[in-house]
Amino acid sequence: MTINSKIELPNKPNQKFDVSKTFKIDSKLSVKGFKDKTEWVPEIDEGYIFDKETTLSILAGFDHNRRVMIQGFHGTGKSTHIEQVAARLNWPCVRINLDSHISRIDLLGKDAIKVRDGKQITEFQEGLLPWSIQNPVALVFDEYDAGRPDVMFVIQRILEVEGKLTLLDQNKVISPHASFRLFATTNTVGLGDVTGLYLSLIHI
C-alpha cells in the first residue's frame, strides 16, 4: 500500500448497514458505509465482541462526521474497536501513533530528492495527514495525549468538521474529503501524568 495513490471509492458512502445485524448489538439504527472493500480497509475479526455504548459513539462519528475520542487504559482495545467498525463498513482506516518520535514533518510531508528523466530533482512528498484528508479515510490518532506540542498544533487545524489544512511551505490549502473521518484514542483525558510521558499535557 502506498499513499501516493488515490483511493477509488464513491465520494460518499453508498450502502446502508443494519447496526443490529452488522455489529450484533441491540439497536434499530442503520448506518452508511461503502459497498466495495479496498486495500486500506482493515481485516474483519469474526470473533470480535462489540461494546454497545462505544460502538454507537464510533458509528456517530462515521455516519454524522463527528470527531470522536475514546478514552481507556492502555491495551483495552480502543483502536481495535474503531478498526473493527471500519472493517464492517468497508471504510478505509489509517492509524498513526503519536509517540515522541512523530514530528510535524512526518505528518505534513517534506522535500525529497527524486530522479526524473535521468536528472535529480527536489519534489515535495506529502505526508499521511494531507493524503488522508483528501481521501475517504478514517484517520485514527493513537495515544493522542502523548503527542508533541508542535504536532498537536497541526492537528488542531482539522478538528473542526470543515477544518481545512494549510500547507504554508506549498502555498496550498486542502479541504477535507466528504468521507474523511477523524478519531483519537487517549489514556489520560487531558490530565497528564507525573512521569512526563504525555508531553502535550504537562502544565507549566
Predicted regions located by residue number:
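AAA+ P-loop NTPase catalytic core and its hallmark functional loops
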Residues: 2-201
